[in-house]
From Swiss-Prot:
<keyword id="KW-0547">Nucleotide-binding</keyword>
<keyword id="KW-0648">Protein biosynthesis</keyword>
<dbReference type="InterPro" id="IPR002300">
    <property type="entry name" value="aa-tRNA-synth_Ia"/>
</dbReference>
<dbReference type="InterPro" id="IPR009008">
    <property type="entry name" value="Val/Leu/Ile-tRNA-synth_edit"/>
</dbReference>
<keyword id="KW-0963">Cytoplasm</keyword>
<keyword id="KW-0436">Ligase</keyword>
<dbReference type="InterPro" id="IPR002301">
    <property type="entry name" value="Ile-tRNA-ligase"/>
</dbReference>
<dbReference type="GO" id="GO:0002161">
    <property type="term" value="F:aminoacyl-tRNA deacylase activity"/>
</dbReference>
<comment type="similarity">
    <text>Belongs to the class-I aminoacyl-tRNA synthetase family.</text>
</comment>
<dbReference type="GO" id="GO:0004822">
    <property type="term" value="F:isoleucine-tRNA ligase activity"/>
</dbReference>
<dbReference type="Pfam" id="PF19302">
    <property type="entry name" value="DUF5915"/>
</dbReference>
<dbReference type="Pfam" id="PF08264">
    <property type="entry name" value="Anticodon_1"/>
</dbReference>
<dbReference type="InterPro" id="IPR014729">
    <property type="entry name" value="Rossmann-like_a/b/a_fold"/>
</dbReference>
<protein>
    <recommendedName>
        <fullName>Probable isoleucine--tRNA ligase, cytoplasmic</fullName>
        <ecNumber>6.1.1.5</ecNumber>
    </recommendedName>
</protein>
<dbReference type="GO" id="GO:0005524">
    <property type="term" value="F:ATP binding"/>
</dbReference>
<dbReference type="InterPro" id="IPR009080">
    <property type="entry name" value="tRNAsynth_Ia_anticodon-bd"/>
</dbReference>
<feature type="binding site">
    <location>
        <position position="618"/>
    </location>
    <ligand>
        <name>ATP</name>
    </ligand>
</feature>
Amino acid sequence: MKFDSNLSINDIETKILKFWKDTKCFKKSNELSKNKKKYTFYDGPPFATGLPHFGHILAGTVKDVITRYQYQHNKRVDRRFGWDCHGLPVEFEIDKNLGISVKQEILEMGIDKYNAECKSIVMKHSSEWKDTVEKMGRWVDFDNSYKTMDLSFMTSVWYVFSQLYKKGYVYRGYRVMPFSTGCMTTLSSSEAKSNYKMVNDLSVVVEFPLKSKLFDKKVSILAWTTTPWTLPSNCGLVVNKDFDYQIFEIDHKFYCMLPNRIQDFNKKEVILHELFKGELLIGLEYEQPFNYFEEYRRCGFFKIIGGSFVSSTDGTGIVHAAPAFGEDDYNCFVENNLIKQNDLVPCPVDENGKFTAEVFDYKGIYVKDADKLIIKHLKEKIFCVKQISHNYPFCWRSEKPLIYRLVSSWFIKVSDSVDKLIKNNEIINWVPKDIKHKKFGKWLSNAKDWAFSRSRFWGTPIPLWVSDDYSEILCVESAEELEKLSGKKITDLHMEFIDDIILTKNGKTLRRIPEVFDCWFESGCMPYAQHSWPFRKVDNLNCEEIRHHFHDSDNTLVYENKILENFPADFIGEGIDQTRGWFYTLHVISTLLFDKPAFKNVIVNGIVLAENGKKMSKKDKNYPDPNIVMKTFGADSLRMYLISSPVVEADNLLFKEDGVKDVSKLLIIPWMNVLKFYTTSLQKRNDCEKLELDNWINYTFNEFLSSVSNYMNNYQLSKVCGLAYKFLDNLSNWYLRIHREEIRSGNTKILFNILKKFSVIMSPFAPFFSEYSFQCLLSSQQNEKSNSINSVHFQMYPEAQDSGDNSFENAKDIIDAIRYLRDKHTISLKTPLKEVKIISDELFMKDAAKFSNTIIRECHVFNLIFVKESEVPELKIEYKAKPCFEYLKKDLKTMNDKIKIINKLTQSEIRDLAFLDLSEEKYNVKRENILIEKKATFPTGLCFASNKFVILVDNTIDDNVLEKKLAREFNSFIQKLRKSCGLKMNDTVNVEVDSEKIKQITKKFYPINFSTEGQIVSPIDSDAQIDVFSYEGQELKVILRLNKFL
């Protein structure tokens, strides 16, 4: 593959994709690594019902970078793709397609037909996914992908569940859960917290008259609610026994609430009466606003009870309790012995969020639509109505507001294992680190029992067969066991294939419970189920159990025998939302099964938002098409843009197309230019001569190599792009520019080696151009011809060489400083500087002096002198010391004392500190705690001061300066003319100009071939190039002739 300057970035990536496919590079790489130590990676399965977006591309890029990098370090990395197939995303799309709004319509249609519809769209966009993943340069195994709907996966989910059941973690109960009326199912706590929106709602303060007098007054208790639709289900009022409550009077009526909240709900004049503790109210009965459930009064309902969750900063300090619709309410009723855990309470709302016949006034009305009707009905009992704006949870799938509702559910007992979860979390390396103890750690510390059952249809059925009274429960652990128990051949575990199976136990008839698993449970089983643990996968429809010999009380032997090689994962990576999703379920299941974490290292990425800061939306069209971005700027540029941003450290990214363009401009194009320079310099070979900056560029490259390795070994991706920019700048704008003539003459050995290694280092990040660069380099070496396939992605990471030195950095700093002075004082680079003096310590000047000729040439200087400060008495240097708070804040106890010491330092003391590190032993302050600024003043010429050196510039103009300026201007004119003619570097020309002065002066400084004639040659050849050079008010005709035309 030869370098072709006519190819665009998109052409190159298309060419490389074809090369990979034609040579089966990915497959070959796996073959080459099959006997190496394994590095385990889990790929979180996406849904193929939607198209891939920038969030998927980000996560996929992070995974690809890490796995390619680990491959380079002698690891075997299985990169197996997976598909999430079950759950609400699929069902909701089918419901929309078929116009289904209630669960009864599914039952009438038939579960078999409904699930067949679901299955038909599961892989709807799989081809688009594969196409996008390949275009972004990710290597992953699609051919051997797992699907959560396959029998081999589902039977393994059953086995995992059966182990949890045997360990006593599974139970059935009632709980107030987040409930989606749009999808007619419960949601997990993490799902419920994933989609909050600001909404306007009506809030009301309702009067609840006490049945008996309080302080000889007929008093109404005032309770506040933002959900008026729950008032028909009121069962109690809750106060805090330690709060002070106030009786107050308005228009001869008496009310009770917190005194500090009265003004928030009342603007009339009030008369204050008794102030007392909430404990006095506990046990008092009141009249409920509706009479639907009056029969519960004999059970102790419709009384005031105590609860610690009551707030003194919002509402009235008195909570209207509807235990069927509030978790705190339900728990408070349990704590007050009004009900037992898992008891039923009035719950007159169905799965569609509509009132049932128990609340006959509002039967069939959707709860949120009933708010205004209820307020109107209770107008005589409403103390006040206010509209409020507040955050409210919405269903992440249907976008309808959630309600909290008492439901029957199956739970995995997690709360008893919080200490284990936290202990295992300590083993995990989180990137960024604060996720461990903040977002994820706090979630773990408040872990609740996991309601894992869902009242849906398209999912893995929960393998529990129960008697009508639940006195007998049988947990089936595999498809094979179900075959033995039922005598029926099992080819599919979806409910339509197994729900007709009736089993018996102890003389009782058992039927399967109707629920399916929360699809998060399936995802959490992925480490085991993708390998069909503990079964051997035969095909997608049949499994054979692998027999294990292990004690019933010790399942660890199964773990040791079967999944030790693949568990825990060395690495996983997904978005920040997965701290409550996949990361959490992986961690819970592995902890409960094996008391081990499921993964060792995890990178948590943030969210990619539109440029305006809003969520990316197809409807709003507020983001570009990823495929167009990749086609325009290249997938490599998109990859590097994403992983070099804070989004790989759990921050959000406002996606900007210009950011991708900048990466192309700063990385790919300079790299391409260096490659082009190399390939066009190969016509001659002269590798014997050692170049002045060879040691420096080798040192710089090894620093780059080591820095990338250090960051990547710590899973810190964001710094790599900046390191690549810096190295390419050093290579292109320093090494190549300074040595361009020598390299053009064939001295390319160092450049070849560096480009080849650079291609290998960059291959995980920019896989396309790395491959192109590598292949171009291989083809440039005639002795490297081979029929075998070779790819940059087969190469191991280069080892750092202990070679080179960094002394040119001092010269570089000097050159940059002189350029800064030129810019500041608007002195053209074409104007030579008469003299430059460098003042510094002896070591600095010794290193810089090695490169005097380079400094002179790069800065266009006549005379460069290195002098001591004492040799320039007119120079005045002032030193100033400031506290460095970045380091001082690490020890807050001593910070103030150290600041006082730093502020008292004298000029001589600061000067000593600038050159000698005596700070800690002499002043009790570390040098790193002090920032030293140097200010220099010089009476004549230009002056620049840094902490390392001072530069004095004599910029006076004399004849020598003017001559060199003219020569440089004329040489620059000739080079531009050559470029406009399209001449190659090795094309030699003769120059004709009608000015002896220009000829003589230019020849002093530049090797230009002038015509021997004293004037313009006539007639002018048709192939000659003509232009005009302006000099001293004259327009001089200049002719350029290729030697072959003369």
